[in-house]
Amino acid sequence: MGEEGGSVSHDEEERASVLLGQYLGCEMCSQEAFQAQRSQLVELLVSGSLEGFESVLDWLLSWEVLSWEDYEGFHLLGQPLSHLARRLLDTVWNKGTWACQKLIAAAQEAQADSQSPKLHGCWDPHSLHPARDLQSHRPAIVRRLHSHVEGVLDLAWERGFVSQYECDEIRLPIFTPSQRARRLLDLATVKANGLAAFLLQHVQELPVPLALPLEAATCRKYMAKLRTTVSAQSRFLSTYDGAETLCLEDIYTENVLEVWADVGTAGPPPKSPATLGLEELFSTPGHLNDDADTVLVVGEAGSGKSTLLQRLHLLWAAGRDFQEFLFVFPFSCRQLQCMAKPLSVRTLLFEHCCWPDVGQEDIFQLLLDHPDRVLLTFDGFDEFKFRFTDRERHCSPTDPTSVQTLLFNLLQGNLLKNARKVVTSRPAAVSAFLRKYIRTEFNLKGFSEQGIELYLRKRHREPGVADRLIRLLQATSALHGLCHLPVFSWMVSKCHQELLLQEGGSPKTTTDMYLLILQHFLLHAIPPDSASQGLGPSLLRGRLPTLLHLGRLALWGLGMCCYVFSAQQLQAAQVSPDDISLGFLVRAKGVVPGSTAPLEFLHITFQCFFAAFYLALSADVPPALLRHLFNCGRPGNSPVARLLPTLCIQGSEGKDSSVAALLQKAEPHNLQITAAFLAGLLSREHWGLLAECQTSEKALLRRQACARWCLARSLRKHFHSIPPAAPGEAKSMHAMPGFIWLIRSLYEMQEERLARKAARGLNVGHLKLTFCSVGPAECAALAFVLQHLRRPVALQLDYNSVGDIGVEQLLPCLGVCKALYLRDNNISDRGICKLIECALHCEQLQKLVLFNNKLTDGCAHSMAKLLACRQNFLALRLGNNHITPAGAQVLAEGLRGNTSLQFLGFWGNRVGDEGAQALAEALGDHQSLRWLSLVGNNIGSVGAQALALMLAKNVMLEELCLEENHIQDEGVCSLAEGLKKNSSLKILKLSNNCITYLGAKALLQALERNDTILEVWLRGNIFSLEEVDKLGCRDIRLLL
């Protein structure tokens, strides 16, 4: 609604129209109906922006629904729009049915104005009551004043109607033109010096605004230039090595994109996040902050965040999607941080993205007037060296300020409010401060298994090549696990010949993969007749100076938070054109116009790899300095720093060498990647390779010993910091992502002795790793260490990205798991069937929690076999999957032969009456089950009858959960009969089942004969207030 703050997307416009349609009839606008639909009305009022809300206020004020005092109460700066909307609903409701009807009409008028602007009526310019007429015709006068506020203000000042101070207040840059017009009208209402009469007469003489200025020639010309510019930047995929020109359209493969769900809020268990398409980025419900403008996409390094934005840009430029935006401005955070001079919003958009050839003033004013048609994207926020803060406020779009202040205020909405912003970042760089200003957060989880295969087929169209690569990955689970990150899929594609010809085994660790790509580049840099079979010492030694130059540059860049290098910086690091020709440094993307082309590493992970290579082999790095790397930051500067305490390592060291200073200043998440690479390079697997390149084998041995000691000591310190267990409970550890990197580093070293030593120190009964970005590679590292535990552990990996490949990686440690929690991990039947095949032989495993995955009837036979074969298995939780009656019937067969299961969860599946019947028949004589959940399974009276027969026979079940089904009175009466014969059930949950007073009376009769049952839940059923009171008095065990 409204000019400057129109509805932010076509989807929201359509939703607002639907909501309005529900209230067009007067009979729908009673106070009772108005109050009943309060949440929808709030959504309607906030579906656009503050401009739309103020348009509604204009109409209500003009119709005298709101008094002047009411109106002033809605002008509290800084109040969230949702708060203002709720206050307006309260005010209108208190005024009666007529006011409620007028609010709906005002919303309708405001929306019509936003879609097809028009003037409403006319007024007498010589009215005897000018202030009253200004209010009566306020919507039309605001629109007429919109483009002429400056001129009218100047004229009013010249004639003495307003002071200079009042002019400055109205002209504050935080206000849009329509808001300035409203503030001028507000001033006229309270001034008795003729300003109202002047405005009423002068505004009538202003030209009628026939349409929004979006069709002006200068605007069309700039939009065309911007589309052409963005299209040119996004049409071709910038491959990591810069050696290929690939059309993005031909090679783009969708990643797994999920909206972040807040599992800590009250209410029913959240559904599994659906895999979203890119086109749903701005239309997904479930906002963290409805008043925010910024969309956040988080993902690990190499997960495809930049390519996702490139795809968005291309779809917009080609006119295929995101057409609600007329202007899209892409920015790279690693480029932005290089801007030392102060800049304004105008400078940022025009000088650093796309320059208007004509009409700069008009185009910039258009952007300010219609921010809802603007999209800004900021790629790589984790590479922006300035930490987010909201302390320094900057609201002027024309006044210059520092680049960090400008960016932070754009994200907060202090600048270009209602313009959409998309930010990509690694998770570790997103602070709680920033999340306050995030509208929606998405997780980019890399390729699915199908995505890996599709990408390889797009990259290799030659007959048989993709098939051979896919077979190789499927036979090599460690390599397959790495490839869920697109950067590794690119490496596999790039090195496909080396992988298919390799006889010594496929890469297992991240370091193995990066050494393989290093071999590929080195071999392609020498004549074909000189190429060796692999990365031998001679090949590496021949280019060692180049690799050390690149390593020195990489380390300096990490320490200075610099990821784009000028010619001067390359020269200072002694990087020669010959070094650049190796291919690891490429032209930076998104180069600032007018500047010389700087260079950057293929990817941030390559910069970390070369920094680790330098630390492993440079004679300038004393071994004792490595402690700074494993500190991951200044002492006490971050949770990671506290996790890895400063280590005292024997050996001489200067007061503060330059390498030490760089390591102390680098970002912790980059140091973690570097530390893992260093551990891999110093492993026994690669010892021979590095030893041939090192003049002093003793120095290399000292580095290796230092890395081992650092890892062992850091893990030991971390384990010792775990608080003792509460009396009667198992010792529990809730790990942080920093712990995952320690385990990853240990895995990169591939030393069983170190893994055993680490496992000995992990004396916990419950290891919790929720929300730790655990993917298949992390699963391999965890299994490498946990398989050596001496006591069984409950391993909780909820809300990660384990997937089928990760499940396969976990199998080596399944024997030491007494419980395995894998909720929300995108696991399918294939992964679970492999897990169960192994679990059949793991006597320790007694509990599986698999909520919110992608399980179907296809895994039912495996589940049934597990139940039938494992007579010490205690709990199976399958909530919110896709199990139908057929799957429930198969599982029931497994239950018939089971004598140990105590907890069985099926909520949110689709077992229906047939499935409920099969389960009930299997459980009638079951001697161990204590808890059964069939919530939300489309069970009716037939299923309830079968469950009632089960209750009549079963003597062990203590809790039966049947909420959100269709049991109704007939089913409840059957259950009541079963309760009369039951002696074990303590809790029966029947909320939201369309039960009336008749069904409740049957339950009351059953309760008279049953002293065991403690609670019967009946909330959300069909009872009047009088019936609720009556039932509650009859038996307090009824929870209504």
Swiss-Prot record:
Superkingdom of the source species: Eukaryota
Post-translational modification: Palmitoylated by ZDHHC5; palmitoylation is required for proper recruitment to the bacterial entry site and hence for proper signaling upon cognate peptidoglycan detection. Palmitoylation promotes localization to the cell membrane. Palmitoylation protects from SQSTM1/p62-dependent autophagic degradation.
InterPro entries linked to this entry: CARD, DEATH-like_dom_sf, Leu-rich_rpt, LRR_dom_sf, NACHT_NTPase, NLR, NLRP_HD2, NOD1/2_WH
Keyword Transport part of the UniProt annotation: no
GO BP: any one term: intracellular signal transduction
Compartmental location: Cell membrane; Basolateral cell membrane; Cytoplasm; Mitochondrion
Keywords, ordered alphabetically: Adaptive immunity, ATP-binding, Autophagy, Cell membrane, Cytoplasm, Glycoprotein, Immunity, Innate immunity, Leucine-rich repeat, Lipoprotein, Membrane, Mitochondrion, Nucleotide-binding, Palmitate, Repeat, Ubl conjugation
Annotated TM spans: none
LRR repeats (start-end): 791-812, 816-839, 844-865, 872-884, 900-920, 928-949, 956-976, 984-1005, 1012-1032
PROSITE patterns, alphabetized: CARD, LRR, NACHT
Annotated lipid attachment (S-palmitoyl cysteine): 395, 1033
Membrane topology recorded in Swiss-Prot or TrEMBL: Lipid-anchor
Gene Ontology annotations for the cellular component aspect, listed alphabetically: basolateral plasma membrane; cell surface; cytoplasm; cytoskeleton; cytosol; extrinsic component of plasma membrane; mitochondrion; plasma membrane
Keyword check for Ligase: no
Regulation: ADP-binding promotes an inactive closed conformation.
Domain CARD: 26-122, 126-218
Subcellular location, principal: membrane
GO molecular function: ADP binding; ATP binding; CARD domain binding; enzyme binding; muramyl dipeptide binding; pattern recognition receptor activity; peptidoglycan binding; protein kinase binding
Binding site residues for ATP: 299-306
Required for CARD9 binding, as annotated region: 241-274
Residue span(s) of domain NACHT: 293-618
Function (record text): Pattern recognition receptor (PRR) that detects bacterial peptidoglycan fragments and other danger signals and plays an important role in gastrointestinal immunity. Specifically activated by muramyl dipeptide (MDP), a fragment of bacterial peptidoglycan found in every bacterial peptidoglycan type. NOD2 specifically recognizes and binds 6-O-phospho-MDP, the phosphorylated form of MDP, which is generated by NAGK. 6-O-phospho-MDP-binding triggers oligomerization that facilitates the binding and subsequent activation of the proximal adapter receptor-interacting RIPK2.
Domain comment quoted from the record: The ATG16L1-binding motif mediates interaction with ATG16L1.
Subunit and interaction comment: Homooligomer: homooligomerizes following muramyl dipeptide (MDP)-binding, promoting RIPK2 recruitment. Interacts (via CARD domain) with RIPK2 (via CARD domain). Following RIPK2 recruitment, RIPK2 homooligomerizes via its CARD domain and forms long filaments named RIPosomes. Interacts (via CARD domain) with ubiquitin; inhibiting interaction with RIPK2. Component of a signaling complex consisting of ARHGEF2, NOD2 and RIPK2. Interacts with ANKRD17 (via N-terminus). Interacts with HSPA1A; the interaction enhances NOD2 stability.
Protein family (similarity comment): Belongs to the NOD1-NOD2 family.
Protein name as it appears in the record: Nucleotide-binding oligomerization domain-containing protein 2
Organism whose genome encodes this protein: Hylobates lar
